[in-house]
């Protein structure tokens, strides 16, 4: 089943997560198939996609990803989005992808992963602010 969600990030602080995609303990591994994000402010920005050393703790307002097919039945909190936390995720040791975007509103990227990047059980992937960044409009497609 494919689930998706679009968000606007709220934090552009250097060395912090802009967005976390979190998987629950069930139904098992999820796979990120596509991630796109586009600058919503004219700020040169540098982002990385990676697995944090530790997931964020106590997300303040997690949002469930939505099924692409409205007939699919999905349990709450299987795949969630987090933009703020009691304690944020920690920096990835390495990045699966990284990009530098010029200070032009609407500039962005769509990363596709044909076989999917695994989001570990009870783990996450983060879009990481490598530099001081502007906010972005972002979306992700995940297969569960």
Give names to the regions the model predicted:
Residues 1-144:
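Surface-exposed, low-hydrophobicity beta-strand/loop segments enriched in small/polar/acidic residues
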């Amino acid at each position: 089943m494919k689930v998706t969600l679009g968000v606007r990030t709220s934090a552009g602080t250097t060395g912090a997560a802009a967005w976390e995609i979190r998987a629950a303990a069930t139904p098992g591994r999820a796979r990120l198939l596509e991630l796109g994000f586009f600058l919503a402010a004219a700020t040169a920005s540098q982002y990385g996609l990676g697995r944090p050393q530790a997931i964020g703790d106590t997300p303040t307002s997690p949002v469930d990803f939505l099924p692409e097919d409205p007939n699919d039945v999905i349990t709450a909190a299987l795949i969630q989005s987090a933009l703020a936390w009691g304690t944020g995720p920690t920096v990835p040791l390495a990045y699966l992808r990284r990009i530098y975007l010029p200070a032009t509103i609407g500039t962005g990227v769509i990363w596709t992963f044909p076989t999917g990047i695994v989001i570990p059980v009870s783990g996450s992937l983060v879009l990481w602010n490598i530099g001081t960044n502007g906010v972005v409009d972002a979306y992700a497609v995940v297969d569960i």
